[in-house]
């Protein structure tokens, strides 16, 4: 009987994955700080990324160094935001957000991923119209009842509240501009989300199966694993990919 990966191998794999996550978050911190300054109290975008970093157990020292590099107090690489759009097999729309110091390298890597998996890159705006940019705050029913969360969300200026009884989850939907304010006002009432992000949500999902589902899953996994890629969004039904 074959043996599974050793404890050391599993730890190395976990450390590698954690390192990639940290690298991507540090780039996000840099871009946010350069765009809006290094003070998170006056830079909502930076505040969001710092919260994400802390949730990933990044130390405050690492966060502070990333901010200092971004605002010129320490030497560092300069990154820019780029977005690519395209189609996976089955007509699945895909948005790829990247941070890069070399556009040629990044577009080559992204295009290769699409081609390898039977998809194709599109032009700017070719699929973005199928998505909405939203702030999403996720709460567990255990922290408060549905009525209390809904009332607090509406008072704070949320756009909508979605209740998922089967998943024991309540989602508060905001505009990107109101995201930080709603999150902070609800936190002041003791309502802390277990997950919070500004994301793209598809207007409707596409169901795929068989070999198409395998190729779509492969493409999304390859894209997410690229160093320059920060986020990957698609309108594929996640249940059909076994990701829910």
Curated annotation (Swiss-Prot):
Sorted keywords for this record are: Cytoplasm, DNA-binding, Transcription, Transcription regulation
Protein's UniProt keywords contain DNA-binding: yes
Q: Which GO terms describe its biological process?
A: regulation of DNA-templated transcription
Localization of this protein: Cytoplasm
Name assigned to this protein = Probable transcriptional regulatory protein XF_1906
**Which domain of life does this protein belong to?**
Bacteria
- List the InterPro entries: Integrase-like_N, TACO1_YebC-like_2nd/3rd_dom, TACO1_YebC_N, Transcrip_reg_TACO1-like, Transcrip_reg_TACO1-like_dom3, YebC-like
Its cellular-component GO annotations read: cytosol
Look up keyword Transcription regulation and say if it applies.
Answer: yes
Family per UniProt? Belongs to the TACO1 family.
Q: Gene3D superfamilies from the xrefs? A: 1.10.10.200, 3.30.70.980
In alphabetical order, the GO MF annotations are: DNA binding
């Amino acid at each position: 009987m074959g043996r599974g990966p050793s404890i050391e191998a599993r730890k190395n794999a976990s450390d590698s994955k954690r390192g990639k996550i940290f690298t991507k978050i540090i780039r996000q911190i840099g871009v946010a700080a350069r765009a809006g300054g290094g003070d998170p109290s006056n830079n909502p975008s930076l505040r969001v990324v710092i919260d994400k970093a802390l949730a990933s157990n990044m130390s405050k020292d690492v966060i502070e160094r990333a901010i200092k590099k971004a605002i010129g107090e320490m030497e560092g690489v300069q990154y820019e935001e780029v977005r690519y759009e395209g189609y996976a097999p089955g007509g699945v729309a895909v948005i790829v957000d990247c941070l890069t110091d070399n556009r040629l390298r990044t577009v080559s890597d992204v295009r290769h991923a699409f081609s390898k998996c039977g998809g194709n890159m599109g032009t700017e705006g070719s699929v973005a119209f199928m998505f909405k940019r939203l702030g999403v705050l996720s709460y567990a029913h255990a922290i408060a009842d549905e009525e209390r969360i809904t009332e607090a969300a509406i008072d704070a200026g949320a756009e909508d509240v979605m209740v998922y009884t089967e998943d024991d989850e309540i989602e508060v939907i905001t505009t990107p501009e109101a995201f930080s304010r709603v999150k902070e006002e609800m936190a002041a009432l003791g309502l802390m989300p277990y997950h919070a992000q500004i994301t793209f949500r598809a207007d409707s999902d596409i169901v795929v199966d068989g070999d198409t589902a395998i190729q779509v899953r492969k493409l999304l996994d390859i894209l997410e694993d690229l160093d320059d890629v920060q986020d990957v969004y698609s309108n594929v039904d996640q249940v059909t990919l076994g990701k829910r």
